[in-house]
A protein has these predicted regions:
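Hydrophobic helix-and-loop "lid/oligomerization" segment in the mid-to-C-terminal part
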Residues: 25-257, 328
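Mid-to-C-terminal polyanion-binding domains and interfaces
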Residues: 131-135, 142-176, 210-212, 224, ...
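A generic structural signal for short coil/turn motifs at secondary-structure boundaries
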Residues: 3-6, 57-59, 184, 357-358
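A generic local secondary-structure boundary/capping motif
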Residues: 5-7, 92-93, 191-192, 324-325, ...
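Hydrophobic, small-residue-rich alpha-helical packing segments that form membrane-like cores
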Residues: 1-15, 25, 37-40
Length: 394
């Protein structure tokens, strides 16, 4: 409440960038600048953008400028560490929000989740190309380890979620817990549960060298403030401590407190049924024919970016298209072709193979689709695909 700066939306990376800019200005005003000049901080906009995106900060105000200009800086490959990390991730040009958020970010975070967080710091700071390659390869390996740990815990958490919903289909929150669940991935697993079931979700783990106290991480849907709920539970003595913001929170509690916490949260969340229903509503920005999707259209859409928290990417709808060539790729992704009399469009539904969405797609019937347009390079050819968000039988 005491903050009147109007900069409460800044991520830590943005705060540091603004702070260093202010130091430069103050040194210049007071005649303290060295004879060879003050350091130019603009080349560090790539790190500022990366931190802003990976912290899921809202993309408005100065954050939007940081990300737009920072991605341009990142594409110049001035940071040997980021270039090495992009190479091990199989990225050509690191110039999009997707690359930063879903390719570079998870690998940088992997050290802190399942290894040594200083590996990422050393990678971003080094000017030595060989050292950068070695550190990037270590982070890539740790990220693969993180994904394996996450997958195992997600399977257990989903089983608990299914059992909880079978007992009470009307419950407004999912809580899963287990001994030995790695604290570095419980937040990711909570996010996966939220995406799958469209419910606020909390995942709790203990052990793993943390001692007897359990740690939990929560993710929420729009309109349901999970941080406030966790704070209230802490004040009432249901848990040891906790807090957060509207979309995410963390907590500490004794393992023996989990059942009481679960019951308290279910009772508390009952009041938000209307908000949860509203969160399921899907806004469609435009209707698109499969044959109208082109690299030029993707480029036009990109001009109003960057997209992220607080600046959603346009959602397109394909009406009454026929699904052909359905196949599972990777662990559980579904790739297919959507076509009508006027053309066809490649589509992919991420992590959908064992979901109701996947079932609709594998039936091979006519469907209505929604999703976001993406373009990538493959064998020297630029192609467009629809990243599918939802589907309904025609």
């Amino acid at each position: 409440p005491d903050d009147t700066s109007g900069c409460g939306h800044l991520a830590a990376a943005g705060v540091v960038f603004v702070f260093v800019a202010a130091l430069n200005r103050l040194a210049r005003q007071r005649g303290l600048a060295p004879t060879d000049g003050l350091p130019d901080i603009m080349p560090f906009l790539d790190l500022c953008a990366l931190g802003t995106l990976c912290d899921m900060a809202p993309l408005h105000g100065v954050n939007r400028a940081f990300v737009r200009q920072g991605l341009t800086t990142m594409a110049r490959d001035q940071n040997p560490g980021l270039r090495a990390l992009a190479d091990v991730a199989g990225i050509g040009k690191t110039e999009t929000v997707y690359h930063a958020t879903f390719m570079l970010g998870p690998r940088l975070n992997a050290g802190g989740r399942v290894g040594d967080p200083w590996i990422a710091a050393r990678l971003l700071a080094t000017d030595d190309r060989q050292e950068a390659v070695e550190l990037a390869e270590r982070l890539h390996a740790l990220n693969e380890e993180r994904k394996a740990v996450e997958s195992a815990i997600l399977d257990l958490a989903m089983a608990q979620a299914e059992q909880a919903l079978a007992r009470n289909p009307e419950r407004g929150i999912l809580i899963a817990s287990g001994e030995g669940w790695h604290p570095g991935v419980i937040g990711i697993v909570a996010g996966r549960l939220k995406e799958r079931y469209h419910l606020p979700s909390i995942v709790i783990g203990w052990g793993q060298g943390l001692g007897p106290v359990a740690k939990g991480s929560g993710r929420s849907v729009t309109g349901v403030n999970i941080g406030d709920a966790i704070t209230m539970a802490a004040r009432e003595g249901i848990i040891l401590s906790g807090g957060g913001h509207a979309m995410a929170g963390g907590l500490s509690l004794e393992p023996e407190q989990v059942p009481a916490f679960d019951a308290w949260m279910v009772a508390h969340m009952a009041q938000f049924s209307a908000e949860r229903t509203a969160a399921l509503e899907l806004r469609i920005d435009a209707v698109l024919a499969p044959g109208a999707a082109s690299p030029a259209l993707v480029d036009q859409v990109a001009q109003i970016g960057p997209f992220g928290i607080g600046s959603p990417e346009p959602v397109f709808a394909l009406q009454s298209v026929h699904v052909t060539g359905v196949r599972q790729v990777g662990a559980n992704h579904v790739r297919f072709i959507a076509e009508d009399a006027g053309g066809r469009l490649e589509c992919i539904a991420w992590r959908a193979a064992d979901t109701p969405l996947g079932q609709v797609l594998t039936n091979g019937a006519r469907v209505h689709l929604t999703g976001k347009l993406k373009a990538d390079e493959w064998n020297g050819r630029r192609r467009v695909q629809l990243d599918v968000g939802d589907a309904a039988a025609d």
